[in-house]
Amino acid sequence: MTGNIVSRRYAKALFSVGQKQGEEDLAAYGLALTELSQILEDSPEALRLFQNPVFSADEKKAVLEKLLEKTSAGPVVKNFCSLLADKGRLPVIPEIASDYAGMLDNVQGVVRGKLVTAIKLTVKRQKEIKTRLEEQLKSKLELDFAMDKDILGGVVLQVGDKVLDASIRAQLQMMKEQIKRGV
């Protein structure tokens, strides 16, 4: 099985446990997984250890327990991670966390997006843009803002799986293609 299928299956299993426990636990499990995933992202040597077949499941569990102490993980998430260690699935924790977060967003009606501009936007302007987009989408929006001078001007908006590229760079690229085709 590929990591994607595996991670979705484990995320779905933990998610169903969280749904039975209630919305508070559902969010807490997601937070703990996100924290653990961030620790692994910041510590690639721990992730390499989890991938290394030379180390036993018990050795990996010992390292995992130390990492879990740095998170808000409760007993359910700790047991879940122990199961992952037993099954040799610790390397897919970041993907499981991502899949779990997507499921949680879906249940809570949250859409994630990213807005890239050529200049830094003020906090007031960011709030205005976010509010207008939420009104248009008719759902709660978690919007990340980024700056990229390479787009020259305009905006690149990604919401969910849709991308709107209204940057000057994209417009210049389209003009270039039209000139090449002789239009």
UniProtKB/Swiss-Prot annotation:
<keyword id="KW-0375">Hydrogen ion transport</keyword>
<dbReference type="GO" id="GO:0005886">
    <property type="term" value="C:plasma membrane"/>
</dbReference>
<keyword id="KW-0472">Membrane</keyword>
<protein>
    <recommendedName>
        <fullName>ATP synthase subunit delta</fullName>
    </recommendedName>
</protein>
<dbReference type="GO" id="GO:0046933">
    <property type="term" value="F:proton-transporting ATP synthase activity, rotational mechanism"/>
</dbReference>
<dbReference type="InterPro" id="IPR020781">
    <property type="entry name" value="ATPase_OSCP/d_CS"/>
</dbReference>
<comment type="similarity">
    <text>Belongs to the ATPase delta chain family.</text>
</comment>
<dbReference type="Pfam" id="PF00213">
    <property type="entry name" value="OSCP"/>
</dbReference>
<comment type="function">
    <text>F(1)F(0) ATP synthase produces ATP from ADP in the presence of a proton or sodium gradient. F-type ATPases consist of two structural domains, F(1) containing the extramembraneous catalytic core and F(0) containing the membrane proton channel, linked together by a central stalk and a peripheral stalk. During catalysis, ATP synthesis in the catalytic domain of F(1) is coupled via a rotary mechanism of the central stalk subunits to proton translocation.</text>
</comment>
<keyword id="KW-0139">CF(1)</keyword>
<dbReference type="InterPro" id="IPR026015">
    <property type="entry name" value="ATP_synth_OSCP/delta_N_sf"/>
</dbReference>
<keyword id="KW-0406">Ion transport</keyword>
<keyword id="KW-0066">ATP synthesis</keyword>
<dbReference type="InterPro" id="IPR000711">
    <property type="entry name" value="ATPase_OSCP/dsu"/>
</dbReference>
<comment type="function">
    <text>This protein is part of the stalk that links CF(0) to CF(1). It either transmits conformational changes from CF(0) to CF(1) or is implicated in proton conduction.</text>
</comment>
<dbReference type="GO" id="GO:0045259">
    <property type="term" value="C:proton-transporting ATP synthase complex"/>
</dbReference>
<keyword id="KW-1003">Cell membrane</keyword>
<keyword id="KW-0813">Transport</keyword>
<comment type="subunit">
    <text>F-type ATPases have 2 components, F(1) - the catalytic core - and F(0) - the membrane proton channel. F(1) has five subunits: alpha(3), beta(3), gamma(1), delta(1), epsilon(1). F(0) has three main subunits: a(1), b(2) and c(10-14). The alpha and beta chains form an alternating ring which encloses part of the gamma chain. F(1) is attached to F(0) by a central stalk formed by the gamma and epsilon chains, while a peripheral stalk is formed by the delta and b chains.</text>
</comment>
<keyword id="KW-0997">Cell inner membrane</keyword>
